[in-house]
Amino acid sequence: VLSPADKTNVKAAWEKVGGHAGDYGAEALERMFLSFPTTKTYFPHFDLSHGSSQVKGHGKKVGDALGNAVAHMDDLPGALSALSDLHAYKLRVDPVNFKLLSHCLLVTLASHHAADFTPAVHASLDKFLASVSTVLTSKYR
């Protein structure tokens, strides 16, 4: 459960992301594909090379979804219901991949906002991304 301090930290961190959410999403996806090559199996139709328009496009979707989640932190299940359905029933993504992408997102955010990435902000973002992952995998059960 996100505390009021966690919510404040997440909102402040996301404000600093600003218009870079899609770029950071794409960078996190690239990190994930390079660090965890098995994740590429869900994207057989994508050009996964650096700077690929398909990775950038999916990165924008990731960034937009996270922005929506930040805006609706008090109702993540409602905000992410359609996305949860898509990943559970149509795409059938292995739930562990959400944890891998979350880790890569944390690394990406830390690399771009090192001065602001305090231990408290890191912990809050980690809890937030874990909550998002839990919601996205809730329909697998």
From Swiss-Prot:
Residues found modified as Phosphotyrosine: Y24
Provide the binding site for O2.
Answer: H58
Say if the entry is tagged with keyword Iron.
yes
Q: PROSITE patterns of this UniProt entry?
A: GLOBIN (PS01033)
According to the lineage, what is the superkingdom?
Eukaryota
Listed disulfide bonds for this chain? Answer: none
Q: Name one GO biological process term.
A: hydrogen peroxide catabolic process
Tissue localization of expression is:
Red blood cells.
Q: Is Signal found in the keyword set?
A: no
Q: Which residues bind heme b?
A: H87
Keywords in alphabetical order: Acetylation, Heme, Iron, Metal-binding, Oxygen transport, Phosphoprotein, Transport
* Modified-residue entries (N6-succinyllysine), positions: K7, K11, K16, K40
* Any one GO CC term of the record: blood microparticle
For the modification Phosphoserine, which residues carry it?
Answer: S3, S35, S49, S102, S124, S131, S138
Q: Which residues form the Globin domain?
A: 1-141
Q: State the family it belongs to.
A: Belongs to the globin family.
Quaternary state and partners of this protein?
Answer: Heterotetramer of two alpha chains and two beta chains.
Q: What does this protein do?
A: Involved in oxygen transport from the lung to the various peripheral tissues.
Name the record gives this protein = Hemoglobin subunit alpha
